[in-house]
Each structure stands twice: as structure tokens, then as C-alpha cells.
Swiss-Prot record:
InterPro entries according to UniProt: EmrB-like, MFS, MFS_dom, MFS_trans_sf, Multi-R_MdtD
Keyword annotations: Cell inner membrane, Cell membrane, Membrane, Transmembrane, Transmembrane helix, Transport
Gene label: mdtD
Cytoplasmic side: 33-48, 98-101, 159-164, 218-224, 284-285, 363-395, 452-471
Lineage, opening ranks: Bacteria, Pseudomonadati, Pseudomonadota, Gammaproteobacteria, Enterobacterales
Protein name: Putative multidrug resistance protein MdtD
Source organism per UniProt: Escherichia coli O139:H28 (strain E24377A / ETEC)
GO CC annotations on file: plasma membrane
Subcellular location(s) per record: Cell inner membrane
Segments on the Periplasmic side according to the record's topology features: 1-11, 70-76, 125-137, 186-196, 246-262, 307-341, 417-430
Keyword RNA-binding: no
């Protein structure tokens, strides 16, 4: 990229900065949840909604981000995304109740939903096609550093300052990023077709109310009648979307996507698989602090081996899949992740803390292999005219399933535990043990889906073409 103009390189730095902000925020909050609960006077068992409110909002808003960027301009939307994300961070820091914090996190999620896809779109428009892969590698690298720094930085700020600072640090960075965007980024627009507002609203309502219903009485205190009503509304909304999308060329997501068998299996497996793996980043730091008495900073440091294992495995995942095939790799990594989850619980409860970094490193390796394989299996056989729509649907499903996973983890803690959990309590460790056992079972279930994948090793070369677009 050395032959790119200085203005283009600065624009790539702005996009990279947005990727870093978004990825850092997805992990920095996890280690702060017990401290937030204490400060806000809430049970730690309710704090999963701090993550769910953000991730679910991202899932709901993702389908609109690309259309908005084409219609209004990439600079205007990227600037708006940074401003909303920064304002959300400010309101998070000022929150005095859990409900205020959830609303602020939702505002953050609106900004986060637009930041990454619009950033990708910006790179496509400002960089020559032959340099696109190198440019995307450059801008996504900070996004890989964010999860590495997030848990430890969050723990450090909580331990030596307060949880408010995990949001306050976004404000000066966001102001600088917003000014740089206005000054340096071009405002590319494109001719757009009419946005499928009806389909968007139906999907948004379906996803939101079903997730809220899943949290149910344990998380939100809803009555059984209200939960039943939410389930009915959610199911009706999704059925109406299917009827709306039938034979509709302007539908948000075409049902023609599901004529490709690998897409259908990959999407179903990705949805089920990420429900299980989405529990781990939430449960691990909470368990280390509440169940084992680790400090926030120590718990954050323990998450680093998992990220390192994930980053290291990405270098060889193509060769692994090409050698063994999708079916073997996905079934093995799904069952392997379930076993590693049980191994983590066992070593932790036995007090073998020195083994935990190695277990978490292994967990990161297995999870990374499964993620990359799921992503590329889903997209590799789609025709070119459906690839963009399929990628957008996969991105939405990834966020939705992670929010459901965190919701289920919080629900399991609520089912097995009391309203208040104390550190070093034998009862607390029993609650976490039952929760981890249930999680291991949920993580293993998608193996039944992946067992139906054709083991067509000779087609796996497509992973190298699709890998980056799916991440």
C-alpha cells in the first residue's frame, strides 16, 4: 500500500480506528460486570443484559447500515456512527440505574452497527480492487488487537479507577475520530433501490421481542402471560417476513439464498454454534471473579491466552479445512469446544489455576477454527448475485445468536442460583458448575447439524476466497 496517496492512507487509518473502537467495546465491558452490579445495586445475575442490549441492537441495525451509507454517503454515516457511539459511551458513564445503562448501550449499538460495515464499504470505494485485500488486512488488524486489550484494560480500569472509565475513555478518542472523518473522508454515494422497510421492521420486531421473551421472568421480571404474548408477537413477525419475502425481488434477504444447501446448513450451524460460544466471553470473567474470587484485572489477564490462541489459529485454518474437510473439522471442533469447556470448569473448581491459561489458549484455538469454518462454509457456494445478501444475513445472525447465547447464560445462572451471589461461597461454585455443564451440552448440540454437511474436501479451496468477507 506504499503507492497509495497520503489522503487515502489517512482514510484507512480512520476506518481502522473505527474497527478498533467497536472491537474493544465488545470485550472491555465483560470484566467490569460484577463491579457494575455492585455500583448499581443489582444482582450480578442480571448484568448479562448490558451485553445483550448492545449486541442485539447491532444485529437489528446491521441490515440498514449499507443502504444508509449508499443513500446518504459513507462519510456522513461513518461520522454519525462515531458520534452515536461516543454519545452512548457518555450516557453509559453517567447512568445511575441498570435501565439507564441498557438504553445507553442500545445507543452505542446503533453506532457500532454502522461503524464496521460502512468502514468495509469505504475501503472498497477508496482503494483499487487489486489492493483491497491488503487494505482490509491493514484496517482489520486493530480490530484483532481490541479483543486482546479489552479484558485486561477493563479489569485495570475497574480495579484502579471505576467502571465508568471503560466508557469515558471512548469520548476523547471519539471526538478526534469524528473530526478526522469530517476533514479527511470523502462522501461517496451510490444509486440505491428502495429500502425494504417493511421487511426490516418485521425482522427487527421478531428478533427483539423473542430475545426479550427468552430472558423471561428471571431476567426482566415479566409475567408468564406477557412472555407468551411476546413469543406470539415474535413468531407472527417472522412468519410475516417469510410471506413478505416470498417472490419479492426487493426483500431485505431473498429466500433464494436457502436453495444453496451449504448456505442453509452453514447458517443453521452458525446460529446454533454461536449461541454456545457466545456464552463463553460473558461467563468466563464473571465466573473467575464471582465464583473464584479473582480481581477484575487478574480476570482480564486470564482472557488474553484465549485471544492469542484464536489469532494464532487463523494462520493455519485454511490448511486444516482443506486437509480434513468441513464436516470433520466442524464436528470435531464443536465437540472439542464442549470438552474444553468442561476441562476449564474442572481445573478451575479443583484450584489448578496455573493450568487455566493453557486451557483458555486451547479454547481460543478450537473456537477460531470453528468460526472460520462456519463462516466460509456458509458463503462458499453462493452465486455472485446473492453473495452480498448472504454475507449481510450471516453478519446479522452472528450478532443475534451471540445475544441469545449471553441471554441463555444469564438465564441458566438465574435458574441455578439465588438473587445474590457471594464470593467464595460453596453454593456459588455449585451454581456455576451446573451452569457450565449446561453450557457444554448446548455447545455440543450443533454437531448434529454439521454432521449433515457433505465432506467435499476438493471444494474447500473456496475458503481462501471467502474467508475475509465473512469475518
Amino acid at each position: 500500500m506504499t503507492d497509495l496517496p497520503d489522503s487515502t492512507r489517512w482514510q484507512l487509518w480512520i476506518v481502522a480506528f473505527g474497527f478498533f473502537m467497536q472491537s474493544l467495546d465488545t470485550t472491555i465491558v465483560n470484566t467490569a460486570l460484577p463491579s457494575m452490579a455492585q455500583s448499581l445495586g443489582e444482582s450480578p445475575l442480571h448484568m448479562h443484559m448490558v451485553i445483550v442490549s448492545y449486541v442485539l441492537t447491532v444485529a437489528v441495525m446491521l441490515p440498514a447500515s449499507g443502504w444508509l451509507a449508499d443513500k446518504v454517503g459513507v462519510r456522513n454515516i461513518f461520522f454519525t456512527a462515531i458520534v452515536l457511539f461516543t454519545l452512548g459511551s457518555l450516557f453509559c458513564a453517567l447512568s445511575g440505574t441498570l435501565n439507564e445503562l441498557l438504553l445507553a448501550r442500545a445507543l452505542q449499538g446503533v453506532g457500532g452497527a454502522m461503524m464496521v460495515p460502512v468502514g468495509r464499504l469505504t475501503v472498497m470505494k477508496i482503494v483499487p480492487r487489486e489492493q483491497y485485500m491488503a487494505a482490509m488486512t491493514f484496517v482489520t488488524l486493530p480490530g484483532q488487537v481490541g479483543p486482546l486489550l479489552g479484558p485486561a484494560l477493563g479489569g485495570l480500569l475497574v480495579e484502579y479507577a471505576s467502571w465508568h472509565w471503560i466508557f469515558l475513555i471512548n469520548i476523547p478518542v471519539g471526538i478526534i475520530g469524528a473530526i478526522a472523518t469530517l476533514m479527511l473522508m470523502p462522501n461517496y454515494t451510490m444509486q440505491t433501490r428502495r429500502f425494504d422497510l417493511s421487511g426490516f421492521l418485521l425482522l427487527a420486531v421478531g428478533m427483539a421481542v423473542l430475545t426479550l421473551a427468552l430472558d423471561g421472568s428471571k431476567g426482566t421480571g415479566l409475567s408468564p402471560l406477557t412472555i407468551a404474548g411476546l413469543v406470539a408477537v415474535g413468531v407472527v413477525a417472522l412468519v410475516l417476513y417469510l410471506l413478505h419475502a416470498r417472490n419479492n425481488n426487493r426483500a431485505l434477504f431473498s429466500l433464494k439464498l436457502f436453495r444453496t444447501r451449504t448456505f442453509s446448513l452453514g447458517l443453521a450451524g452458525s446460529f446454533a454454534g454461536r449461541i454456545g460460544s457466545g456464552m463463553l466471553p460473558f461467563m468466563t470473567p464473571v465466573f473467575l471473579q464471582i465464583g473464584l474470587g479473582f480481581s477484575p484485572f487478574h480476570a482480564g489477564l486470564m482472557m488474553i491466552p484465549m485471544v492469542l490462541g484464536s489469532m494464532g489459529m487463523k494462520r493455519i485454518v485454511v490448511q486444516v479445512v482443506n486437509c480434513f474437510g468441513y464436516r470433520r473439522v466442524l464436528v470435531a471442533t464443536t465437540l472439542g469446544l464442549s470438552l474444553v469447556t468442561l476441562l476449564f470448569m474442572t481445573t478451575a473448581l479443583l484450584g489448578w489455576y496455573y493450568v487455566l491459561p493453557f486451557v483458555l489458549f486451547l479454547q481460543g484455538m478450537v473456537n477460531s477454527t470453528r468460526f472460520s469454518s462456519m463462516n466460509t462454509l456458509t458463503l462458499k457456494d453462493l452465486p455472485d448475485n446473492l453473495a452480498s445478501s448472504g454475507n449481510s444475513l450471516l453478519s446479522m445472525i452472528m450478532q443475534l445468536s451471540m445475544s441469545i447465547g449471553v441471554t441463555i447464560a444469564g438465564l441458566l445462572l438465574g435458574l441455578f442460583g439465588s438473587q445474590h451471589v457471594s464470593v467464595d461461597s460453596g453454593t456459588t461454585q455449585t451454581v456455576f458448575m451446573y451452569t457450565w455443564l449446561s453450557m457444554a451440552l448446548i455447545i455440543a448440540l450443533p454437531a448434529f447439524i454439521f454432521a449433515r454437511v457433505p465432506n467435499d474436501t476438493h471444494q474447500n479451496v473456496a475458503i481462501s476466497r471467502r474467508k475475509r468477507s465473512a469475518q
